[in-house]
Amino acid sequence: MDDVAADPSHPRYQSLLLRHRLEQAEQQGLLAGSAMIAHGRGEAYDYLLGEQTIVSAHLATLYALDALKRANHPVLSLNGNAVALAGEALLKLAERLDCPVEINIFYRTPERMEALLGRLEAIKSELNLDVKILGAEPNARIPGLKAVSYTHLTLPTIYSV
């Protein structure tokens, strides 16, 4: 990562580093114009919540992981911010879950898709991961994939508060 003019003792240092990574990703064509707004909205809530993961958010994360583990055909659906900030971690997760990732973005352009797919392919190659990357074809359908309601699932008791 390029040098960023941020003092490591600054209370929002990690936030500044993430913001810088998004700035770089935008320059590389990975992000939509609204990406910084979306990230900033999340950062505002993080700040208001005291920079801590609240119990309900932690439980939601565990619930999502449990749903992915139980799914017959899980797929991790990624946007530009996810690729820019957590592409490596998400590809590693996909390999552990034995599932593909897909680029699924609202503001789709051929250039942006090429940049996002290229970034994921580079990470995949560098880490020697066995993960299928979907999304190159704009009208493609994933066989057997249907919208699912998770209201019938119950959270395992180990995740209860």
Regions found by a protein language model. Name each.
Residues 7-10, 142, 155:
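Intrinsic-disorder/low-complexity coil detector
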Residues 96-147:
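Long, charge-dense
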Residues 1-102, 110-112, 118:
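Electropositive, gly/pro-rich neighborhoods at or near active sites that engage anionic ligands
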Residues 152-161:
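Single conserved hydrophobic/aromatic residue that forms the stacking wall/gate
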Residues 77-80, 104, 136, 153:
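Short His-Asn-centered micro-motif
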